[in-house]
């Protein structure tokens, strides 16, 4: 029973959103994610972006991450976008009404980096210059997030305030946000009933499905903060997460653009593999 409870805690701490961040990864656990977005571009050709991510829990409250991204625009060749190095720290040892986490990320990208890990600043996110020129342009920055979240049993609410500091001329800061509400699957409730559902339910079962909403967008920059929101990108998505096993989960998020410069449609997918003390002890549940 203790092993199962530990697995449930690890799974409950698996973030279901694509842009919003909340829980730290369990201590000594490794979370691997392969994510891909199909975007119906407002300006230019449609494109597909991809990101590979690895998160590791150094302590119960401190997580480090490395991410790399690329993209394929219709009619053009595949291009490498760059690398991200991130870390986030949960400030409180115990649960609070508002659980506070601080996040920092160094970005070493090029002008062809199009994956929407976050949205900040002003204007659209499509590539409007030749790909060959964009790949030669260095884009270095430092992203900071103030993360607040709370769980009411299976219901999670998460908010991220995002600031991106440009580390090269003309410097400056861009701002954004991400907000999510997610209702976890019944097997992740942490209750005796949820644990029974996990051990008894077949691989294909509605009890393994979680669902919610995520909204993310930009808030301007130093000079124009929270003004003319229609000139900034905003998206609303329906989040679906399916717990396949003690190690694997699948996420899908169809999203629509809410402003004149947003891409009209975006389909986000993600496959997650979690390995650590809790999941390795729970492998027998999958057999």
Describe every region a protein language model picked out.
Residues 3-287:
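Transmembrane beta-barrel domains of Gram-negative outer membranes and organellar outer membranes
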